[in-house]
């Protein structure tokens, strides 16, 4: 499945070190939030949150200079609960970034962070709380 076509690739390439990318489920107010981001429009990829995260992380690393580079929206009323969608994304993050847990972020704080992001990708993820923030790290030079 080809998930990263031209406009998605442009956004990922245009992002710099420290820029946030929001991976959102179908219930997240992606369009209205995306209007306040640097890109200014929502990107859509009809795949699960974990599939989109895997595709993104094949193109750029997560920031290693901050603790909240990989974050997830907390479950309202149960901030420490880890739902299956969160575990699936955690598995993808851990595969490239090591075993550090994603930082939980309260729902409205997550919305605020999302509005400051470079871009929002709305996925086809229909499970609740399938919303994540990934802060772009430093892309190393090619091996010589």
Set out the residue ranges of the language-model regions.
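Short His-Asn-centered micro-motif
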Residues: 24-25, 123
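Short, small-residue-biased leader/transition segments that mark boundaries at the very start
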Residues: 1-5
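Short coil/turn connectors at secondary-structure junctions
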Residues: 8, 16-19, 39, 115-117, ...
């Amino acid at each position: 499945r080809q998930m990263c076509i031209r406009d998605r690739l442009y956004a990922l390439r245009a992002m710099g070190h420290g820029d946030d990318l929001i991976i959102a489920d179908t219930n997240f107010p992606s369009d209205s939030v995306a209007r306040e981001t640097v890109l200014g429009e929502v990107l859509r990829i009809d795949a699960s949150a974990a599939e989109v995260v895997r595709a993104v992380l094949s193109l750029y690393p997560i920031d290693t200079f901050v603790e909240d580079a990989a974050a997830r929206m907390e479950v309202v009323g149960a901030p420490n609960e880890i739902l299956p969608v969160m575990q699936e994304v955690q598995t993808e993050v851990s595969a490239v970034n090591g075993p550090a847990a994603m930082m939980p972020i309260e729902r409205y704080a997550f919305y605020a962070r999302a509005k400051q992001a470079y871009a929002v990708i709305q996925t086809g993820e229909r499970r609740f709380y399938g919303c994540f923030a990934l802060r772009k790290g430093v892309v190393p030079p090619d091996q010589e």
